[in-house]
Design a protein with these regions (language model features):
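Polar/charged low-complexity regulatory segments
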Residues: 1-78, 84-87, 91-93, 104, ...
Length: 144
């Protein structure tokens, strides 16, 4: 869907492509990335203030992707940064510096960040799809 919004729709709609869709998605990505970065900074500050370790990196899954658009790259980065935030929150929680409720709330927020962007992608995709379908219907109807 992200490919359809960033690559396919601009090629099909050309001048009729709604640039506000792309700007809206960029804003959504930036907002969620900012939230994740704030959580990473807050968690690192808490670990440093308490003199605690940030823990060992867990087993890393290799990531292989053919990324063709800046927003796709930003989406992958958002997942990776949210995962780092969750790892740091886990380290804080395991060392007793974060309550169970605080851990659940903060890790839940980090899990929702990429899902929030996914919702934005789905909405933009639906709007672009409607415009493309209308364009095709108009073309198929011929000149009037």
């Amino acid at each position: 869907r992200l490919y359809a919004v960033c690559v396919f729709a601009p090629n099909v709609l050309r001048d009729a492509y709604p640039l506000e869709e792309l700007e809206s998605l960029r804003d959504c990505f930036a907002q969620q990335a900012h939230k994740v970065e704030k959580m990473i900074d807050w968690t690192r500050a808490q670990l440093d203030a308490a003199g605690l370790n940030s823990g060992e990196p867990g087993r890393v899954e290799p990531l292989s992707a053919d990324i063709r658009t800046p927003l796709a790259s930003a989406y992958v980065d958002l997942f990776l940064r949210a995962d780092l935030a969750i790892q740091l929150l886990d380290a804080l929680w395991l060392q007793g510096e974060l309550t169970d409720a605080g851990h659940a709330e903060r890790t839940g927020a980090m899990r929702r960040a990429p899902l929030s962007v996914l919702g934005g992608i789905q909405r933009a995709y639906a709007r672009c799809r409607e415009r493309i379908e209308a364009l095709y219907r108009q073309r198929d109807a011929g000149p009037q």
